[in-house]
């Protein structure tokens, strides 16, 4: 086992705080509408230019192991806030730095670290309750657009496109972000349920222009096994032909005689049919077929539940207003399922999302919710260079997370104002002893830090602006973008409550751990062994000419 380097007490905390300051100073430069850019070197290719706090934090590794431990712990604050709320990483870092710096000073002055931590925790608890009281629900598209704009560093086009996407696919809908091919941002919306399986034969195509098979008001047969014998399908085909409607067959596989018969019937115009493979594999396939059944008001024909294909009737089939089948995708639009049943199914899947620990499973379950709840929107980010594209895509993803958080827990006035307003609730607290009260005071000063940093980045004097904001009430604050004072909600400067809350709670959590740290252990630096001296010539061979 390698030897360890151990530091205690003040020496350990000083080094740790030094690391915190290095990371926080780099990250906080990006805060606010007038935040600066940070350039990140890449091991290959052009450097990345970003105003995203978590991207900056992730790049930082320090040479001194003890300083690096401090930096890594604050990096954890940024990452955790990003995971919880999708934004607020820079705010969380600024709060953590303020709490740790003041806390370390208090410990150096001889105060009890545990009492300081208790005081900070008490203050944060009161501040979170006050934030929830200040919070207003997000209902209209305008508020959603404003939240997106602020999170995307005041880029209105990003805020508007996110609001439009949410309007089209609903609050539960899946919105994904991709790199586009043009200069402008584009929104592509797929309504209804789409899955990545196309027609099994090109003879099913009935729309030559789009090279797709379009079915209006079709019946939908869902089966979880292979269909190779046409006799099994006859009762269903006869029923559909009598009704004079087209038919979509979704099964594990349609092959051989069954597929040939369907193609012949379609070409002759006897019955319009399209066959596609069921999406997914194994249990996921069964679950997706069940989702389709709920969406279309049909039943999955499965021997597991005692339903045989040859016994199926037209009553077991689902319905939809329209189905479009291309070479690669099938889209079911406006299924005839009962809305209460669909909602119950969505609730069931959401419970599974909460229970799963796998990110992959969670993503797939969220996709299923979206397909049942309304559709999928794809935001295609446009830019003129690859560097700009990467930076813009990161901002769009941040803004999207922030708007989701706003829909979830509501919004508070932005620009650091919400934390300043929460000071009132914290200011009335007193601790069980003097050290705890000092912990509360540390939290009070730290909660001013985000506003101070936004103002400093805008080139103004933080204390002057802060005092003026404190004199106001409610949404009154400072718009750093144009230097005006006024109602932050009217200015459109809003922060999701979840983002501000997560930033404060995560910062306090790490600060509490660091203040109460008394020893640090790291691998001792290895001393390089001197290289062996170069060997001379062989003895007894003098005089030989080499």
UniProtKB/Swiss-Prot annotation:
Stated name of the protein: Chaperonin GroEL
SUPFAM superfamilies per the UniProt record, alphabetical: GroEL apical domain-like, GroEL equatorial domain-like, GroEL-intermediate domain like
NCBIfam families attached to this UniProt entry: GroEL (TIGR02348), PRK00013.1 (NF000592), PRK12849.1 (NF009487), PRK12850.1 (NF009488), PRK12851.1 (NF009489)
GO biological process terms, semicolon-separated: chaperone cofactor-dependent protein refolding; protein refolding; response to heat
Homology family: Belongs to the chaperonin (HSP60) family.
HAMAP family reported in the protein's UniProt record: CH60
Alphabetical list of PROSITE patterns matching this protein: CHAPERONINS_CPN60
PANTHER family to which the protein is assigned, alphabetical: 60 KDA HEAT SHOCK PROTEIN, MITOCHONDRIAL (PTHR45633)
Subunit structure as annotated in this protein's UniProt entry: Forms a cylinder of 14 subunits composed of two heptameric rings stacked back-to-back. Interacts with the co-chaperonin GroES.
């Amino acid at each position: 086992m390698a030897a360890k380097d151990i530091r205690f007490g003040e020496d350990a905390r000083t080094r740790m705080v030094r690391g915190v300051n290095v990371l926080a100073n780099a990250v906080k430069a990006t805060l606010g509408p007038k935040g600066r850019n940070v350039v990140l070197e890449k091991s290959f290719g052009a450097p990345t230019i970003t105003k995203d706090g978590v991207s900056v934090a992730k790049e930082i590794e320090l040479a001194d192991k003890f300083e690096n431990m401090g930096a890594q712990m604050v990096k954890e604050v940024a990452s955790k806030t990003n995971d919880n709320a999708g934004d607020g990483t820079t705010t969380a870092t600024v709060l953590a730095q303020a709490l740790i710096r003041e806390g370390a000073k208090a410990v150096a002055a001889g105060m009890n670290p545990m009492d300081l931590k208790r005081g900070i925790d008490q203050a944060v608890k009161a501040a979170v309750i006050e934030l929830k009281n200040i919070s207003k629900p997000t209902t209209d598209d305008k508020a959603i657009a404003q939240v997106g704009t602020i999170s995307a560093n005041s880029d209105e086009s990003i805020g508007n496109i996110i609001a439009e996407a949410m309007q089209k696919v609903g609050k539960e809908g899946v919105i994904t972000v991709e790199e586009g091919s043009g200069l402008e941002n584009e929104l592509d919306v797929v309504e209804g349920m789409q899955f990545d399986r196309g027609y099994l034969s090109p003879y099913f195509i009935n729309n030559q222009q789009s090279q797709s098979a379009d079915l209006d008001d079709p019946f939908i047969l869902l089966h979880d096994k292979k269909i190779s014998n046409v006799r099994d399908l006859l009762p269903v085909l006869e029923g559909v032909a009598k009704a004079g409607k087209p038919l979509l067959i979704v099964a594990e596989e349609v092959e051989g005689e069954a597929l040939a018969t369907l193609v012949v019937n379609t070409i002759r115009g006897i019955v319009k049919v399209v066959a596609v493979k069921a999406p997914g594999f194994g249990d996921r396939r069964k679950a997706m077929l069940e989702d389709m059944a709920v969406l279309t008001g049909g039943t999955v024909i499965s021997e597991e539940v005692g339903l045989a294909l040859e016994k199926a009737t037209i009553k077991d089939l689902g319905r939809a207003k329209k189905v479009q089948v291309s070479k690669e995708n099938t889209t079911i639009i406006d299924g005839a399922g009962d809305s209460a049943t669909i909602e119950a199914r969505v609730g069931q899947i959401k419970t599974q999302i909460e229970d799963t620990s796998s990110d992959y499973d969670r993503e797939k379950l969220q996709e299923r919710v979206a397909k049942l709840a309304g559709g999928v929107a794809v935001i295609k980010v446009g830019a003129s260079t690859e560097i700009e594209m990467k930076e813009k895509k990161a901002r769009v993803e941040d803004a999207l997370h922030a708007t989701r958080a706003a829909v979830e827990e509501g919004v508070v006035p932005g620009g650091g104002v919400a934390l300043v307003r929460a000071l009132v609730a914290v200011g009335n607290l007193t601790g069980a002893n003097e050290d705890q009260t000092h912990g509360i005071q540390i939290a009070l000063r730290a909660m001013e830090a985000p506003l101070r940093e936004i103002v400093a980045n805008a080139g103004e004097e933080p204390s002057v602006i802060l005092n003026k904001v404190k004199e106001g009430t409610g949404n009154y604050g400072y718009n750093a973008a144009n230097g005006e004072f006024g109602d932050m909600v009217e200015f459109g400067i809003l922060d999701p409550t979840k983002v501000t809350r997560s930033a404060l709670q995560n910062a306090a959590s790490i600060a509490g751990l660091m203040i109460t740290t008394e020893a640090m252990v790291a691998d001792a630096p290895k001393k390089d062994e001197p290289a062996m001296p170069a060997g001379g010539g062989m003895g007894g061979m003098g005089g030989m000419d080499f």
